[in-house]
């Protein structure tokens, strides 16, 4: 069923054979209304500037006041929330995955804005085009283009 930007689908037939599906109860799927990634930056203003001005993410809402105010950004079908202040950067294995329409265009724009590219765009063995950057706290960000011929684009 289509609900605007969020598509909700029934669990696939194979799901009744997956052991973890039992964790969802008798209803088949958890009814998730919204989702967000929570980051607690070491310097909230620096991170806010990076995500807003450098990556160009749109602000959904802000809360609180002062330099440590929280900011929630639109992130495709979910949200990214910067809130609080951490004493140390997040775990080194923390990463974000952002899908864009055209990776070459995004690469050019980020280069013009001075974003250090950790890894240049490359087609992975699984068929996705990926490049890597990092936020000011070192949170790795995989920026991905799903090519037209990739199975993720199929609507069978």
Region spans (language model):
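Vicinal oxygen chelate
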Residues: 33-42, 71-74, 87-113, 129-134, ...
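Core segments of cupin and vicinal oxygen chelate
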Residues: 31, 38-80
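A short acidic/small-residue loop/turn micro-motif
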Residues: 88, 125, 146-150
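N-terminal beta-strand motif that seeds the catalytic metal site of vicinal oxygen chelate
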Residues: 17-48, 94-96, 147-156
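Extreme N-terminal basic, low-complexity initiation segments
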Residues: 1-11
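Ala/Thr-enriched low-complexity intrinsically disordered regions
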Residues: 10-13, 29
């Amino acid at each position: 069923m289509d609900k605007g930007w969020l598509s909700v689908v029934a669990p696939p037939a194979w799901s009744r054979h997956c052991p973890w599906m039992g964790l969802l109860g008798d209803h088949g799927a958890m009814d998730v209304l919204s989702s967000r990634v929570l980051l607690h930056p070491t310097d909230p203003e620096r991170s806010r500037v990076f995500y807003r001005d450098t990556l160009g993410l749109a602000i959904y809402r802000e809360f609180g006041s002062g330099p440590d105010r929280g900011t929630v950004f639109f992130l495709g079908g979910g949200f990214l929330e910067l809130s609080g202040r951490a004493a140390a950067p997040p775990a080194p294995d923390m990463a974000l995955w952002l899908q864009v329409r055209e990776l070459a265009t995004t690469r050019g724009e980020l280069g013009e804005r001075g974003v250090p590219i950790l890894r240049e765009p490359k087609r992975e063995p699984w068929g996705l085009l990926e490049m890597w950057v990092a936020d000011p706290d070192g949170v790795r960000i995989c920026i991905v283009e799903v090519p037209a011929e990739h199975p993720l684009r199929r609507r069978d």
